[in-house]
Amino acid sequence: MKRLFKYTLIALAAILVLPAAFLCGLYLTADMEQPAVTIDTAAYRVTNHGGYTTCHGSFLRRNPHGLWELYTAGPPEESGAAAGALTAGLMHYQEQVFVDQIREFVPSEGYLKFLGGMIRIFNRNLGRHVPEEYRREIYARSLYCSHDFDAIGTPYERQLNYHAAHDIGHAMSQYMLVGCSSFAAWGGASDDGKPVVGRNFDFYMGDDFARNKIVTFCRPQAGYPFASIGWAGMIGVLSGMNSEGLTVTINAAKGPVPLASATPISILAREILQHAATIAEALEIARRRDTFVSESLLVASARDGRAAIIEKTPRRTVLYEGDGEYLICTNHYQSEAFDDDGDNRENIAMTDSPHRFARLEELMAANAPLGVPAAAAMLRDQRGTGGKDIGVGNDCSVNQSIAHHSVIFKPATLQMWVSTSPWQGGAFVCYDLGAILRNPDPAAELYDSAQEIPSDTAYLARDYPRVVAYRQLGARIRRAMKAGRKADGELIETFAQTNPQNFHTWKLLGEYYLSQGDDGRAAQSFGKALEAGIPRRDELLAIERLKSECKP
C-alpha cells in the first residue's frame, strides 16, 4: 500500500510538473527570428524644421486636422530606422495606451503576466511567418522603442507581437474590439463607372488609441509605393492603396480558435498592397500565406475596374465576386464555399454582422449611383434597418462611434479621403497619392483642401456630446457596481435619458439593479432592453435568462 501511495504521488507530481516544464521549455526557446542586422542609430538624426521633422530621407508632419503624415523610402532597415527615430514619442504613447487598455480588460497583474507568457508561447514561431524584409523594418523601428515595457518582452518582440493585435482582438471578439464595415461600387453602381470604396475600421482600444492616427506614404525598395492608415510602429496594412490603384481593407470573420501562430493579417495585407496590381495577383499572394485567424479582404483594382473579396481562413482561401456591380463586407463570409461552415453560420445567426450588412444594402440602394460624398454619408450612418433610431454607439450601426479610422478610396484617380476626429464626425481629408509620390515635399501641405468632405455638423452638435456623456456615465455606474455601492439616483436617470434607444443602456441598468438586489427594477430594465432590439443572439439569450431569474 505504501509503495502504491508512493507511486501515486510520483505520478501526480509528473502530471503537474511535466506540463509546466514543457511550457517553460516552449517559453525559453521562443524565437522571433530577430534579423541579424547592425544599425548605427547615431546616423539617424532627426532635424526639426519648425512644422515638420526629417531624418535620412523620411519626414513626419502633422496637418491642421490633426492627422500625422509620415513619408518613408529606401531599404527596410533604413526606412524603418528613420521612421523609428521620427515617431519615437508617438510609439511610446501608442504602447502606453495599448498596455493601459489591456490592463483595464485584465486588471489582475498576475493574470496579465500569465497571459503575456502564454502569448509568448503561442507566438513563439511568429518570426518565421513574417517575411524577412518586414522583420528588418520592424526591428529597425524597435530600436527607438521605450524600455518601460520590457517586462512584456524586448522592444523587437513587442513590436512584432503588436502586428498581431488585430488578430488577438479578433480572437477576443466578446470584448467587441473588432467589427468593421466596408463596401465598393463600380460600373452602373458608381457615379462615374469607376470603383469607389468605403470602410470603417472599427478596432476599439479606447478613445486615446485613435488619437494619433498616422497616414503613411511608403516608397519601399522593392514593389509598389503605397499609402496606408495606422498608428506609430505599425508597418502592416489595415486600409491602404498603392500606386497602381489597388486597395486593400481587412474585416474580421469568425473561424476556428487558432492553435499556433501564422502570418498576421496586417502583414498579409501589406504584402498584397506592396506587390499586387490586380485582384488575381492579390489572390495569388493570399493563397501563399497561412493566417491564424479568419478574415475578409476587400480588394479593389483600377486595372480590373471592380472589386472582389478574398475570404480567408487558416485552412482555405476563396474569392467572392458577387453577381452585381457592388459589394458589401461586414464580418461574415458570403461565398457558397462557406454555406456549410459551422463557424460562419453561427456568426451570421449570433452576431450583429448581418444587421450592418442589411443596413448597408439599404444605403447602397438609396445612394446609387454612389459617389464620394454619399460614401461618406454611408460611413457616418447611425440608423438601424429601415432607418430606425437605435441610439448612438449601437452594434447594429455602420457608425458605432468607435472607429480608429474611416476611409474612402477612388483607385482610378489614386485619391483617398481619411477621416479626422472624432471618429467619422470630422472632415474627410483628401490625399492624391500620385501627386504626393511625384513630389513628397515636407514643407508643403500634402492634402488637397479643395476636395475635402466637410465635417458632420449635425453629429458634432447633437450626437457626439451624447456619446461622450453616455460612456462617461456608464463608466461611473460600472465603478459603483464594482465597488458594491449605490449609484446616485440622478446619475441613473441621466444615463437612461441620454441613450434610451440603445439596448446596452437598459442592459447595464438591469445589471446594476441586480447588484443592488432590486429584482423588480432589474426585470423592468431587461424588458426595455429586449424591446429595444438586441443584435447578438447570444446576448439576447443572456438577457432573457437574467430577466427570467429576477424574483417577482
Predicted regions and their residues:
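C-terminus-biased signal that marks the final domain/tail of proteins
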Residues: 19-173, 177-179, 273-296, 301-307, ...
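N-terminal Sec-pathway targeting helices
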Residues: 1-20
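Short, flexible segments with low predicted structural confidence
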Residues: 9, 108-111, 253-257
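Surface-exposed loop/turn and secondary-structure junction residues enriched for glycine/proline
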Residues: 240, 244, 275-276, 313
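Acidic, Ser/Thr-rich peripheral helices and adjacent loops at domain boundaries
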Residues: 317-322
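Short beta->alpha transition motifs characteristic of CBS
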Residues: 201, 251, 310-316
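Internal mixed beta-strand/loop scaffold within catalytic domains of large alpha/beta enzymes
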Residues: 158-268, 284, 404-408, 416-419
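Short beta-strand-to-turn element immediately C-terminal to the catalytic PLP-Schiff-base lysine
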Residues: 185, 300, 310
